[in-house]
Swiss-Prot record:
It is found in: Secreted. This is Defensin-like protein 32. Disulfide bonds join C40-C62, C48-C73, C52-C75. It comes from the Eukaryota. GO terms for biological process: defense response to fungus; killing of cells of another organism. Belongs to the DEFL family. The lineage of its organism: Eukaryota, Viridiplantae, Streptophyta, Embryophyta, Tracheophyta. Gene3D superfamilies: Knottin, scorpion toxin-like. Keywords: Antimicrobial, Disulfide bond, Fungicide, Plant defense, Secreted, Signal. Residues 1-26 form the signal peptide. It comes from Arabidopsis thaliana (Mouse-ear cress). GO terms for cellular component: extracellular region.
Amino acid sequence: MVSSRKCVFLVFLCMVVLLNPKSTKAKDIDGRKPLLIGTCIEFPTEKCNKTCIESNFAGGKCVHIGQSLDFVCVCFPKYYI
């Protein structure tokens, strides 16, 4: 019962992220945390990296998160020393 509630919550969360048009453009919130911007179907590897770089991140990569989710585009922050 608990796992089905988690599944429903994750599906709902994914739908909100995917249906929100503002979530498709990466935003540098504080420049320190990786940011998930969408699925790799929406952002193929080349477009994922390019979108992240254009949004002031160091780069982006399609990564697999968990068993129930497909590959998602994650932007990695720039670190300044």
